[in-house]
């Protein structure tokens, strides 16, 4: 059971890297990618203790080859609206802001940090998701920076890449 976590600022290319790794690994193994966007409790509660608890449950279940039930957030309804049973796979890839936080590193994940400057990251996100979220994204950039500083995510990731 291999656990990978891809973290870094919004717009850095974490989802793209996760998709490439999943495609490569799935040729010979079972793989599941979990996107942090699906686990966040909206904009304001995204990087709090609920995410940490969910990640702890996910990583422990994965390493024990057990199932884990996870709540998924619906961004259109702005609430959690479904649960899914995550079954054991050979590889579990966690990707998104907060994916490589301390609880995941403690579980022995191979961790990747993708870096990007804030303005380029913002431009990429707005091109992908729409200009209507610019206000939320600017606040998100502050939240993610605080999270990264407190958690020392970048400093503790094994592999550092720049996009």
Label for each model-derived stretch:
Residues 32, 38-92:
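Conserved nucleotide-sensing/catalytic segment adjacent to the nucleotide-binding pocket
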Residues 130-163:
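Small-molecule kinase domains that catalyze NTP-dependent phosphoryl transfer to phosphate-bearing small molecules
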Residues 8:
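The Walker A (P-loop) glycine that initiates the GxxxxGKT/S ATP-binding motif of P-loop NTPases
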């Amino acid at each position: 059971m291999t656990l990978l976590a891809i973290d870094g600022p919004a717009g850095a290319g974490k989802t793209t890297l996760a998709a490439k790794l999943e495609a490569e690994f799935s040729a010979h193994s079972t793989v599941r990618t979990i996107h942090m966007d699906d686990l966040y409790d909206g904009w304001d509660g995204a990087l709090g203790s609920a995410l940490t608890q969910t990640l702890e449950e996910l990583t422990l279940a994965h390493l024990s080859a057990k199932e884990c039930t996870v709540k998924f957030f619906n961004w259109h309804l702005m609430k959690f609206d479904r649960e899914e049973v995550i079954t054991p796979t050979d590889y579990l890839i966690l990707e998104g802001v907060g994916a490589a936080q301390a609880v995941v590193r403690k579980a022995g994940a191979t961790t990747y940090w993708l870096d990007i400057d804030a303005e380029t990251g913002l431009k990429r996100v707005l091109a992908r998701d729409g200009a209507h979220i610019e206000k939320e994204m600017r606040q998100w950039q502050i939240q993610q920076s605080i999270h990264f500083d407190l958690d020392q995510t970048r400093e503790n990731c094994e592999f550092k890449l720049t996009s």
